[in-house]
Each structure stands twice: as C-alpha cells, then as structure tokens.
C-alpha cells in the first residue's frame, strides 16, 4: 500500500506533442485531404487537430487502440488521393511520412484517422509516443480528480470564434439537469444564458471546482468529515486527518513496521495539495471542500497501483500461469455468418491476448493461397498471410511475453502447408521459436520454459508428425476425399507419442490397446451421438495430419488427444496440451476436480466454447480458472459478462497476458479441491464489506438508479450478489443510497476472486461497471470510476464506496482475536460484564441447557438377568428427575449492548448534539445582533465585540474585549431606545430558549420511543431464538436418553446370554428385559417432558417480565425528560437575564452596581455563561 506516495505517476507528454505538427489528414471514403495542425494537450487527455477554418476535432486518448506507421499504416485507395501524394512515382517517400490512429469503443467498431506529415519519420515518432500515452496504465486507471480535470480541459479548448467558452457547452457536458447547471453557474457569478459565453480567464480551476461543488454537492462526505473533525469547527485538524487516514484509509492487515502509518508531516503535504484556503493550509487545517478533493485524489485510489504493472514472478514454467486466450479470433460477429477480419488479430493482441486461433483451410485455384475461415459456415474468408502479417505487426506492442498461435489445421495439401510454414518463417523471423531451448529439452519430467525465457517469441500449436521420414506429397491423408474436403469419418488424432516411445515394447502395446479402445468406442456410437459430439467440438475434431514443414515449427505446445488423467500422469510430458470444449471440461471438473488441478500443475490445457454457441456468446471462465486451466479461450468480439471479467482481470500485471497461479495450484505437494468449503492450506480467507454510498453524474438523463455488487470466485465462497434499492428520486447527478454494507464473509481464496460493481437504470439499462480482483483492492473510502461494457473508461460516471477488508475469523474465535489484539481492554470489559450478569442471574451457569444424563451402575458391572424385573423405571425416573439448570433469557443489560441498540443510541446522541449546537449558535447570533444594534447608538469607535471562548465544545459568549466608552447623554439618563432594544432582545431570547427546550424534549421523546421499539424488536428476536434453541436441545436430550437406555437394554441381553444357555429361558428373560425397558423409557420420557415443560414456562415468564420492564422504561424516561424540560423552563428567565446582564453590563453601569462583578477585560478567559448547553444531554439519550 502506498497511500501517500502513489506507485505509478501519470504519463508525461513530450513537448513536441503539445507544440503540434503540421499534417495532411485524408479520408478514403470522401477522397478529401486537408491540412491540419495535430496536437496533444499538455496533460495527455486528448489528441486533437485544428483545420484551417479553426474547427477542432477531438479524440480521447483512452479511446485510442493502436497507432501505425510506414507499411502498416493505411494506404489511400482513391486515385485522387494517390495523385495528391504522388504515390505512383517510383521515388515516392509516402511510407516514411504517414501514420494512422485507430480508435473505437470496442474491437469491432473501429475508426481510422490517417495523417501524412510534411517531413520524413515524423509520423513514426508520433505513432510511438501517442500509443505510449494510450497504453500507459494510469491513462485508463486515473483518479477521479483526473477525470474531472479532463472535463475542464475540454471546456477550455472548445472555444467560440471570439475565444470564449460557450455556455451551451456546459449544458451539453452536463445534460441530466439543466436547471441545476444554471443554478451552479449563477452561484459562481457566471453567465447562464444559452447564447452567452464565458471568458476563460474567469473560469480558472478554483471556479470550476466551486461550480462542481454547487452542481454536485456531497452531503455524504460532509457526514464523514463531521464524524472526524472537532465539534462545531468548520475544519479538520492535521491530527484528526492523520487519525482518519490511519483508521479508515489504511488496510488493517498491514504490518505497521513494514508499512508505517501516516505521519503528521506527510498529512501536512496532503493539506498543502488539496486545501483551497491558504489560511487553513498555514494552520494545518482541512475544510470540507478540501476533504472532497482529497478523497478524489490519486492517494485514495481504489486500486493498488503496483498490481497494474508487472509485479509477479515471470520465471515460473509456462503452465503455472493463466494465459489470456481467444477463440476463433478472426470472427467479428456470429459463428455461423458474418465477416472475418485480419484486423481482429491486431485488436485482440493489442488488448493483451497471448493465444490466438487460426482455422486454416485449403485455398482454391488458381492462387491456392491458404485461407482462414470457420469451416462449413457462411462466414467470409481472409488470406492466411494477411492474418500472419497482422500478428507479426502487433504481437508484442502491448506485452513482450510469448504469443501462442493455436492452429486448427484443415489444409490437406502438403504444398499449401509448406506455404503456410514459409509465411510463418518469413514474417515472424527470429521471433518464431522453431527449436527447443537448450535448458528445456522435450523430455518426460522436464518443465516448460518460463514466459521470461520465451520473451519476444512466437510458439506454434499444431499437430506434430512424430515419424522421422518425410511426408509423401502424393499420399492423401486418411479421411480426405478427392475434392480435398474431409469426409464424414474423422481423422485419427495424434496422441503425442514420440518415435522414442515406439521403440519401447510396453508403451507400444499400450498404444495399440488405446487405439483399439477408441475404435471400439467410435464403433459403438450411433449417428446422433456422433453428430452431437461434432456439434460440441465444432470442426476441431476434423483436423488433418501435419506435414513435415508445419510439423517442424511445433515444439513446446504439442496438441494431444486426452485419454485420462492417469495416462497423462504416467506420460509426464509437460509439452503436451489437450483441448476441451466447455462441456467436456465441466464434466471432468465435476467428476475429478482435484485430478484436473493436478493435471494443470504438470501441463497445459485449453478450454473453448461449445460449437452450438452460434451467437458467439461466452461461458463463465471462472470455473475453469478455479481448476487451474491455463488457456480459457473466449470470443473476444462479444462483450458479454464473461468477456468483461476476462478483460478486467488481464488488465493487471502490466497487461502482460500472463497471471501467475496461486502457490497451491502450482506445487505438487499441495492438494486443492475447487469445490471446497473449508479452509484451504496456506491461504488466509478474507472478509470483504462494501458500502455503496453515492454516485456522481451516472447518466445523461434524470433517472432512478440502483447498484449491483457481485462476487466471482470459488463455489464455496459466500453469497454472490447483492443489490441496492432504487435511488429515492430521479437524480442521476448525485444520488445517495443509505443502506447497510454488503458483506462477503468468507472469501476462501482472495487471489481467485474478483468483485463486480455495476450501475443500472430503473428499467435495467446498463450504465457502467467495474470488475477488480480482490487482492488489488484498497480499504477505505474511494471513488470508483466506471467502465463501459468493453472495459473503456467513462469520464463522468463514478460511485463513492467504502471498502473494508480483513482476515476472516470464525465466530467461535472472534473473542479470542479481540483478546489477543488488546488483552487488557478485553479482560477489563469481560470482568465488568460478568459482574453485571451475576447481579441479574445470581450465578453464571456453564451451559444454558445441560444434558440429562442417564444413570449407570457405579461399578460398571454387567446387570444380571434377575434384575430385569425389579422396580421397572426406577433408575430411569432417577435419571429424568436429576436437576437441570434453568434456561436464562437475555437481560436488559445485554440487550443494551446489542449492536443495533448501540448504533441507534449513537445516532440519537449525534442528533442531540447537533440540535444543541444549532440552538447555541442561534442564541449567540441574537446576542451579537443586540450588541451590534447597541453599537449603533454609541460612538463607532466604542463598539462591543463578541468572541468565541476557548476550551469548550460549544461557543461561549464573552461580553466584551475592551472597555466600552459610553456617551455622556447615555450616562446622564436612560435612553428609551436602549430600553426598547433590551426588552426586544430579552423577549427574543426567551422565545428562542423555549423553542429550543421544546425541540430537545420532542426529540428525546422520539428517541425514547425509537429505542424502546428497537429493544422490543431485538428482545423478541432473541426470545424466539431462545425458545427454538430450548426445544431443539430438549429433543436432542430426549433422543440421547433413549439411545443410552437402548444401549443398557442390549448390555442386559448380552449379560443374560452369558448366564444361561437354555433357549427357552433366554427367550423368557429377553421378554422381561424388553418389557422392563419399555416401562423405563415411558417413565423417563414422561418425567423429562414434565421437567422441560416447567423450565419452558419459567423461561417464558422471564421473557414476559423482560418485555414488561422494557415497556416500563419508556414511561420512566419520558417522565424524566419532561421533568428536565420543566426545570429548564423555570430557569430560563433567570438564564436570559444573566446573559443580558453579562452582555450589556458595560453599557448599563447602574445594573453593574446593583450586582457587582469583575470588570470585563480583554483576557483569554471565556465567559462562564453557557446558554442552552447541558453536558449531560447527550448521555441522557442512552437508555
């Protein structure tokens, strides 16, 4: 955690970008080329260009997906444009001057902005540096204050021809409520007419912040501020802010030595940064407005910034990582119809994906160029070489770590396969890994190389020919028809066995058995089952044999048909990869989850969507990540919830496309069951509490909104989804939700869990959301900037939330944890509670309901057969009549300590304090006004001053700071104006006091009613639970008694068989024992039932008495509050006169002589008078 020093700083804009450069912008569709000046604003928010007509166009840097220069940039197709740029001349240098910016809301809806510079190589620099700004992790994860600053920057750049900010731009920027925008502009003394304009000099950052505070007030932050600052003070001191940061904004699980708490000098730096008032900065004080901007700053980011960069160990074997993977990458729409595009390979790789899929099919004459398409569907084709070229360009723009090309090869032509291999070798060059690394040979038991070892490399996943002899070009593979298309008989898949295996007799025999079993299984399948299997797998089951050229490119990622987990463990080859449809993977996960996890510790697996997902929808990847599956492939063109989760999680670790699995999913000596509900070894479970407090600028319309909070993790994790109520009004600017926190009590593996927070309109329309891994969250108050469905940052919408994370502690150990944290405090409180309980109950029973023991012989000797008929039920009766501890009900003292009651009392105390503070302030205002009116009757130089006293929570009244010089005419005789002023002020003070005391009385009566109702509600809940527990215990004890009596019956029968061997005698004695047993059980049950009924009656009597006591308390406290009110009303007249005398004693010397008092001096001592303040008032609200 780095609260005071953010790990990642925002990107820096190079000087030449903000100064601008001349370009020609061209568009192929319109065939128009126009000169522009291209710039980036100094803060790096916008790329914008200005036409000769002074018209400006903006492009948000967060929407930029790629920049390209040279041969990878767009080339004009229009002949008119080609002539403009002299492209048909042989010595043309167009490729050295051009660059293209690609932007769009998702990977499919793209826009290409094409620019040509006047100088060579300028476009290259612009392309590289603009992409660096767009890809910087803090561009998309900026603080709330940064996103608000973006609005100001744009307003100041969109100027009218006169160089002013049009007011209509404000209405366009904040369209939800025009009246509120007008009111906020008026509050800042700015023009508000639609056709008006504002001078940029009149709208600096300070005015903009005031405008935002007027447009979007933050009462919820004011409440937080009030709870931590000095009472009745409009500021928070440095010490209070330090306490707030260390208590609320700091993760309580952190070690205080390794991560020391905030220090006052660090907090002073925060005050210097965020406090708008210079005077407060000098005094080390933070105002409520400063608090708002502090909570919007980067120091309070909801994310741990270090998780955004590469922070994980990248030297582990490749199969120890989750790998960002794509399915049918070339598709832009559905699986059955729609266009295919090589551009998708670029976009997917730019998003951080490290495994893309190429479905290769044989090209048609005359070119016979291999193509990529979805076989046997209506999707369009793209050339294989175009896809390879796109991959070569974009493979390592976002991440330097290895890219895996997953080939689904249906090209049955050796010549076309050779052409494919040649394209790969030529276009990928040295980045293509064709031979195993020296330290990681392809041998059983050897681990895979790490992402760091394979840095900058491209790996091919394709069938590998295991025979040393070259493939015959004239021989057609099995299962391929003359027309070149696969026949209905699927080609046998490679099992990943090497030529080395075939020299071993035992393994060879084993292979034959496996093949025979597969053939038998295939023969036993009926036609419908075969069709179903093919529909689930798509065309993956119809791959053809790999010929030598393609086979030679395969090394660490060799596909193999999955036989069984045992078979794979026996082979122990880490370079073998099996692919599963989501259905097959789910079946394996359901039947053998722990074996699946162990399999993924050793080698890699790939999961892909079932073939029936024609709409390109996705399955939830979480279940397969839980099993450790590395390549969980999804359809990147569909931005549904599974894809959103995938993109959100792989944004972390530097968007490298690799996330290190947890230790227990990597170590062979650890066992992990994804369906476990218990504690997992070496993992500390986490408890997460989230309170959704408010939202800001959620929608462009005035609508009611709600928030959904959802947890993704293991099946054994707690409740998955919560939802707030609808916002009270159709207010999308600053809605507030006053609800209890949502608690996820026991998150078993935080490293495998993530939190989704989504905002919806009343009708369910999506507004924005955010998905964040649990281990990347910070505790405290945070502004959560929302994202679109395609994970693009939204500038305006945000949520204000409170997060609290702590280590999970079971309820049974909660007291022990508290005791260990603060032993002295815990045992002191425990002793006090014990004393109170003893006073109420007289003793402290160890158990509320003790079990009813069944009597047994003291010496433990077996019962003889002759004892079976004597005194039936006597011992059972003795057992049933043994003394049972009477159950106790919850006492009044315990009810008062319940969380719900305590919380309500604290709220009431706060309300009373606020009421008293307002009354005291009104009293003081009346006295100050009277003093000011008196001053008007005197010389201006001799005015009476009032100042707040020190050392008090409330403001006290001090009569004067200086001796008042009274005019001669006032001393010689009473002035009627002064007397009228005195009478009027006395009457106002009397009315104010009566009104204040009535308000306090009414509020206290209301508080008493609410607290009594709360106690009654909790008491009834407790009592219902007590009765239920009592009945359950009674049933358990009865069953236990019957079991013991049954065991005694069997002991008697066994003892009897040892005494006599006569069958007739044995039957007779057995009947006697059984009859005696029945009588004993009946007597014991009857006696126990009577005892328990008596105890239940006593328990119900105690509960009724408790409820009556609670009801009686209401009347007592109402009477007490009324008595206090009457006493205060009686003393109000004297209190008013005393306040009047204290304030005007210097102005009325006659009164001062009648009641001598120490003269008023300009001292630091405060006046002893404290109007309307009763120090015990706040305590009296507690029952």
UniProtKB/Swiss-Prot annotation:
All residue ranges annotated as the PI-PLC Y-box domain in the record: 550-666
Native organism: Rattus norvegicus (Rat)
Sequence ranges assigned to domain C2 in this UniProt record: 666-794
Catalytic activity: a 1,2-diacyl-sn-glycero-3-phospho-(1D-myo-inositol-4,5-bisphosphate) + H2O = 1D-myo-inositol 1,4,5-trisphosphate + a 1,2-diacyl-sn-glycerol + H(+); a 1,2-diacyl-sn-glycero-3-phospho-(1D-myo-inositol) + H2O = 1D-myo-inositol 1-phosphate + a 1,2-diacyl-sn-glycerol + H(+)
Region (Disordered) residue spans: 462-537, 857-888, 1150-1183
Sorted UniProt keywords: Calcium, Coiled coil, Hydrolase, Lipid degradation, Lipid metabolism, Metal-binding, Phosphoprotein, Transducer
Cofactor-binding details, from the entry: Binds 1 Ca(2+) ion per subunit.
Coiled coil: 1077-1146
Gene: Plcb2
Tissue expr: Expressed in the gustatory cells of the circumvallate papillae. Not detected in non-sensory lingual epithelium, brain, parotid gland, liver, uterus, lung, heart, adrenal gland, ovary, spleen, pancreas, intestine, thymus, kidney or muscle.
Binding site for Ca(2+): 328, 357, 359, 408
Protein name (database record): 1-phosphatidylinositol 4,5-bisphosphate phosphodiesterase beta-2
């Amino acid at each position: 955690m780095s609260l005071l020093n953010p790990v990642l700083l925002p990107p820096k804009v190079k000087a030449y970008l903000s100064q601008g450069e001349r370009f020609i912008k061209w568009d192929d569709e319109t065939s128009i080329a126009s000169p522009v000046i291209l710039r980036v604003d100094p803060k790096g928010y916008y790329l914008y260009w200005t036409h000769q007509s002074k018209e400006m166009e903006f492009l948000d840097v967060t929407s930029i997906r790629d920049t390209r220069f040279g041969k990878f940039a767009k080339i004009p197709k229009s002949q008119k444009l080609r002539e403009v740029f002299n492209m048909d001349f042989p010595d043309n240098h167009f490729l050295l001057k051009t660059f293209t910016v690609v932007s769009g809301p998702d990977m499919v809806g793209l826009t290409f902005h094409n620019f040509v510079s006047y100088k060579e190589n300028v476009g290259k620099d612009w392309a590289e540096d603009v992409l660096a700004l767009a890809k910087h992790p803090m561009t998309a994860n900026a603080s709330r204050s940064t996103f608000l600053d973006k609005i100001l920057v744009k307003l100041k750049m969109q100027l009218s021809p006169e160089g002013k900010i049009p007011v209509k731009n404000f209405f366009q920027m904040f369209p939800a409520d025009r009246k509120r925008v007008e009111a906020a502009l008026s509050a800042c003394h700015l023009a508000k007419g639609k056709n008006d304009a504002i001078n940029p000099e009149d709208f600096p950052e300070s005015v903009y912040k005031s405008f935002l505070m007027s447009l979007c007030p933050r009462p919820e932050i004011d409440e937080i501020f009030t709870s931590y600052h000095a009472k009745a003070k409009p500021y928070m001191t440095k010490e209070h802010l330090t306490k707030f940061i260390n208590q609320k904004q700091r993760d309580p699980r952190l070690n205080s030595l390794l991560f020391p708490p905030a220090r006052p000098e660090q907090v002073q730096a925060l005050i210097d940064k965020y406090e708008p008032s210079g005077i407060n900065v000098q005094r080390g004080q933070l105002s409520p407005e400063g608090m708002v901007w502090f909570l919007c700053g980067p120091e309070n980011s909801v994310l741990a910034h270090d998780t955004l960069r590469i922070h994980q160990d990248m030297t582990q074997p490749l199969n120890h990582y989750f790998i960002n993977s794509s399915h049918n990458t070339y598709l832009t729409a559905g699986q059955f119809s729609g266009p295919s595009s090589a551009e998708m390979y670029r976009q997917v790789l730019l998003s951080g994906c490290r495994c893309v899929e190429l479905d290769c099919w044989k090209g048609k004459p005359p070119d016979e160029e291999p193509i990529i398409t979805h076989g046997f569907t209506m999707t369009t084709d793209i050339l294989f070489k175009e896809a390879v070229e796109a991959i070569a360009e974009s493979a390592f723009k976002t991440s330097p770590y290895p890219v895996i090309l997953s080939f689904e090869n249906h090209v049955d032509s050796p010549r076309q396969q050779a052409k494919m291999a040649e394209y790969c070798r030529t276009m990928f060059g040295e980045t293509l890994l064709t031979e195993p690394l020296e330290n990681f040979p392809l041998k059983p038991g050897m681990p895979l190389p790490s992402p760091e070892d394979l840095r900058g490399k491209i790996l091919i996943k394709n069938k590998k020919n295991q025979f040393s002899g070259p493939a015959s070009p004239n021989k057609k593979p099995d299962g391929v028809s003359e027309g070149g298309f696969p026949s209905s008989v699927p080609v046998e898949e490679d099992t990943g066995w090497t030529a080395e295996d075939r020299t071993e007799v035992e393994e060879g025999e084993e292979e034959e058995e496996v093949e025979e079993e597969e053939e038998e299984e295939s023969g036993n399948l009926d036609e419908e089952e075969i069709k179903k299997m093919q529909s689930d797998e798509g065309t993956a089951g119809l791959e053809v044999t790999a010929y030598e050229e393609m086979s030679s490119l395969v090394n660490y990622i060799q596909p193999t048909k999955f036989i069984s987990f045992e078979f794979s463990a026996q082979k122990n080859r880490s370079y073998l990869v099996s692919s599963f449809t989501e259905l097959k993977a789910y079946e394996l996960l359901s039947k053998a989850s722990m074996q699946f996890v162990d399999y993924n510790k050793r080698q890699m697996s790939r999961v892909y969507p079932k073939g029936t997902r024609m709409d390109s929808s996705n399955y939830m990847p979480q279940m397969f990540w839980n099993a450790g599956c590395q390549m969980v492939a999804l359809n990147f063109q569909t931005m549904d919830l599974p894809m959103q989760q995938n993109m959100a999680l792989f944004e972390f670790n530097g968007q490298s496309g690799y996330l290190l699995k947890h230790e227990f999913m990597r170590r062979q000596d650890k066992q992990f069951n994804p369906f476990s509900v218990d504690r997992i070894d070496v993992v500390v479970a986490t408890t997460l509490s989230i309170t959704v407090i408010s939202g800001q600028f959620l929608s462009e319309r005035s609508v009611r909104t709600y928030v959904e909070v959802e947890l993704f993790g293991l099946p054994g994790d707690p409740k998955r989804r919560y939802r707030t109520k609808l916002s009270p009004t159709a207010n999308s600017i600053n809605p507030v939700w006053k609800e209890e926190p949502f608690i996820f009590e026991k998150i078993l593996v935080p490293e495998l869990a993530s939190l989704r927070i989504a905002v919806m309109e009343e009708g369910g329309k999506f507004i924005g959301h955010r998905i964040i891994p649990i281990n990347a969250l910070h505790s405290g108050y945070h502004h959560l900037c929302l994202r679109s469905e395609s994970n693009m940052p939204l500038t305006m919408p945000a949520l204000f939330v409170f997060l609290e994370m702590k280590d999970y502690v079971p309820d049974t150990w909660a007291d022990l944890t508290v005791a260990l944290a603060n032993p002295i405090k815990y045992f002191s409180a425990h002793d006090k509670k014990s004393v109170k309980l003893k006073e109420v109950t007289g003793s402290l029973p160890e158990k509320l309901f003790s079990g009813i023991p069944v009597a047994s012989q003291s010496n433990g000797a077996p019962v003889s057969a002759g004892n079976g008929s004597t005194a039936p039920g006597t011992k059972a009766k003795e057992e049933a009549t043994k003394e049972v501890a009477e159950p106790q009900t919850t006492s009044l003292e315990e009810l008062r300590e319940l969380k719900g009651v305590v919380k309500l009392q604290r709220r009431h105390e706060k309300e009373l304090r606020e009421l008293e503070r307002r009354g005291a302030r009104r009293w003081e205002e009346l006295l100050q006004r009277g003093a000011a009116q008196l001053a008007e009757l005197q010389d201006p130089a001799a005015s009476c001053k009032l100042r707040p006293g020190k050392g008090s929570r409330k403001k006290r009244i001090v009569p004067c700071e200086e001796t008042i010089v009274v005019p001669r005419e006032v001393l010689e005789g009473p002035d009627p104006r002064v007397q009228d002023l005195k009478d009027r002020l006395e009457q106002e003070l009397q009315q104010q006091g009566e009104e204040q005391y009535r308000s306090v009385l009414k509020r206290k009566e209301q508080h008493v009613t609410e607290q009594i109702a709360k106690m009654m509600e909790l008491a009834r809940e407790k009592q219902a639970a007590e009765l239920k527990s009592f009945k359950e215990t009674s049933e358990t004890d009865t069953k236990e008694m019957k079991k013991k009596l049954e065991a005694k019956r069997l002991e008697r029968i066994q003892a009897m068989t040892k005494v006599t061997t006569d069958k007739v005698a044995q039957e007779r004695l057995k009947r006697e024992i059984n009859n005696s047993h029945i009588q004993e059980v009946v007597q014991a049950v009857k006696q126990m039932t009577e005892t328990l009924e008596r105890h239940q009656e006593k328990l119900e009597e105690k509960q009724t008495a408790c409820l009556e006591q609670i009801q009686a308390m209401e009347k007592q406290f109402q009477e007490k509050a009324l008595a206090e009110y009457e006493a205060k009303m009686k003393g109000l007249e004297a209190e008013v006169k005393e306040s009047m005398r204290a304030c005007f004693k210097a102005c009325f010397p006659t009164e001062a002589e009648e009641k001598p008092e120490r003269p008023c001096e300009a001292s630091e001592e405060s006046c002893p008078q404290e109007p309307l303040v009763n120090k015990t008032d706040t305590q009296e609200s507690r029952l």
